[in-house]
Amino acid sequence: MASSSDHTAKIIDGKAIAHTIRSEIAEEVRGLSEKHGKVPGLAVVIVGSRKDSQTYVNTKRKACAEVGIKSFDVGLPEEVSEADLISKVHELNSNPDVHGILVQLPLPKHINEEHILGAISIDKDVDGFHPLNIGKLAMKGREPLFLPCTPKGCLELLARSGVKIKGQRAVVVGRSNIVGLPVSLLLLKADATVTTVHSHTKDPEAIIREADIVIAACGQAHMIKGNWIKPGAAVIDVGTNAVSDPSKKSGYRLVGDVDFAEASKVAGFITPVPGGVGPMTVAMLLRNTVDGAKRVFGE
C-alpha cells in the first residue's frame, strides 16, 4: 500500500471545468439567438477607478464576448451620489436588452451598498445578493431566482468532480455575506451536515479535521494546515491572498487559505490557487445571465 507521504490529492482544475461550462453556455447563446433573434445582455456598473475592480470588469467583459453575451459597461465617477447611482440602476432595470445587472463592489464609503443592491430588480440580480434572493436561499422549499456566483461555483466544482455532498460533513471556514454564509446555505440545501468555523470558534482545527468537505473562505493565507485535513476530504479553497515573493516580477504571489503543498498530501480532492474557484465565479455569472434571459424569452 502507498504510504501517506506519496499520496497526492486529485487536483480540481477550475480553469478546465470553467472552460467546459463556457463552451456549453456559448452553444446555448447561439441557440437563443437563432430562436429569438436576441442574445442575453449583462450590464456591469463600476464606480471610480480602483485597479482591482477594473481588472475584474475587464475579465467579465472578455468572458461575455467569448460566449456571445452582450456587455453594457457603465462607468461612473468616484464622487457619484447614491441617488444618481440608484437612478442608473433603475434605468438598467427597465432596459429590456439587459438581463443581468452587476454592481462591482466595493463601492466608495459615501454609498450604502445595501441600498444599491436592493435597488437591482430581483429578476436581474445575477450576483444573487438581493435580500429576497438570499432570503429564499435560506428558506426550505423556496428557490431563489439566482444563486451567488462563487458559492454556486464551489458546488459545481464538487458536482463535476464526482464528490458526494448528501449526508457528508461539510465545514465552511468563514461567514461572509459573499461566500461563507451563502455556501453554507447551499450545502444545507444539498443535504450536507454543515458547520461554520469563524473568528470566535474554539478549536477550529478539531472541527475541520472532522470534515468530508472543507470550503475555505476566511481570507487568511495558509491558515488551514495539512494536518487539519481529514484523509480523503475534498477541499475547495476560495481564498486569494497576496504574499510577498521577491522572485516574482510583481513582488508577490497569490496563495489560498489552505496550505496547498501540505494539504494535497492528505486530501482526496483539492482546488489550486489560482486556477480553482476564480474561473468558476465568472462562469457562474455568465450562467446566471443566460438563465435570466431565458426566463424573459419564455424558455
From Swiss-Prot:
Keywords: Hydrolase, Multifunctional enzyme, NADP, One-carbon metabolism, Oxidoreductase, Photorespiration. The keyword Hydrolase applies. It catalyses: (6R)-5,10-methylene-5,6,7,8-tetrahydrofolate + NADP(+) = (6R)-5,10-methenyltetrahydrofolate + NADPH; (6R)-5,10-methenyltetrahydrofolate + H2O = (6R)-10-formyltetrahydrofolate + H(+). Its EC number is 1.5.1.5, 3.5.4.9. Transmembrane segments: none annotated. One of its GO terms (cellular component) is chloroplast. InterPro entries: Aminoacid_DH-like_N_sf (IPR046346), NAD(P)-bd_dom_sf (IPR036291), THF_DH/CycHdrlase (IPR000672), THF_DH/CycHdrlase_cat_dom (IPR020630), THF_DH/CycHdrlase_CS (IPR020867), THF_DH/CycHdrlase_NAD-bd_dom (IPR020631). GO terms for molecular function: methenyltetrahydrofolate cyclohydrolase activity; methylenetetrahydrofolate dehydrogenase (NADP+) activity. Pathway: One-carbon metabolism; tetrahydrofolate interconversion. Disulfide bonds: none annotated. One of its GO terms (biological process) is photorespiration. Homodimer. Belongs to the tetrahydrofolate dehydrogenase/cyclohydrolase family. Catalyzes the oxidation of 5,10-methylenetetrahydrofolate to 5,10-methenyltetrahydrofolate and then the hydrolysis of 5,10-methenyltetrahydrofolate to 10-formyltetrahydrofolate. This is Bifunctional protein FolD 2. It comes from Arabidopsis thaliana.
